[in-house]
A protein has these predicted regions:
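Extended hydrophobic secondary-structure segments that form protein cores and membrane-embedded regions
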Residues: 65-69, 117-118
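Active-site beta-strand termini and strand-to-loop segments that position acidic
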Residues: 31-32, 53-57
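Histidine-centered divalent metal-coordination motifs
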Residues: 44, 48, 121-123
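Active-site beta-strand-loop-beta-strand hairpin of nuclease catalytic cores
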Residues: 57-65
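Metallo-beta-lactamase
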Residues: 1-40, 45-46, 68, 74, ...
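Accessory terminal helices/loops
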Residues: 58, 73-159
Length: 159
């Protein structure tokens, strides 16, 4: 993330990747036999994306929703002592956009029966704790990441 001439993490040799294509809302990205559905879901930045894909456990299919960029930034000082460059009005607009993204994501989850919630930030979905539960899993026990549609709704509401 760049803030004008500075960069968010104060990396001396920041190399910005070259954009080779853009991804559209609702696009399916195909990787061999695997398909990842893309959902535009503005949150802390306008380009935030959610992803959905199928996984299998013990021969049973499950639908994952991977939510990225949830939350909003308000005015203040952030890591690296950078001041957030926008006003309270911007933060309110951002919060309304974020709320719309939450509703859109939930509607997708209901329609597609998502039963696994992931987040690219492990602490925002108890990923490490859930993985520990799975390590102790006995044959025939449900995968701890499979939380059902209501469990997915809870994570979306709490984020």
């Amino acid at each position: 993330m760049l803030w004008g001439p500075d960069n968010y993490l104060d990396i001396e040799d920041l190399r910005v990747p070259r954009i080779t294509r853009t991804i559209e809302d609702g696009e399916d990205l195909v990787f061999g036999d695997h398909t990842v559905h893309v959902i535009l879901a503005p949150g802390h930045t306008p380009g935030c994306l959610n992803y959905s894909f199928e996984v299998h456990d013990n021969g049973q299919a499950h639908r994952v929703i991977m939510v990225g960029g949830y939350g909003v930034f308000g005015p203040g000082i952030y890591p690296g002592k950078h001041e957030y460059p926008h006003s309270v009005t911007y933060a309110v607009d951002q919060a309304l956009t974020f709320a719309t993204s939450c509703v859109k994501t939930w509607e997708y989850c209901k329609e597609n029966h998502c039963d696994v919630y992931l987040n690219p930030h492990p602490h925002l979905c108890a990923m490490l704790e859930t993985d520990e539960k799975n390590k102790a899993r006995k044959p025939g026990e449900e995968n701890a990441f499979v939380i059902g549609l209501e469990g997915v709704r809870k994570w979306i509401v709490e984020r």
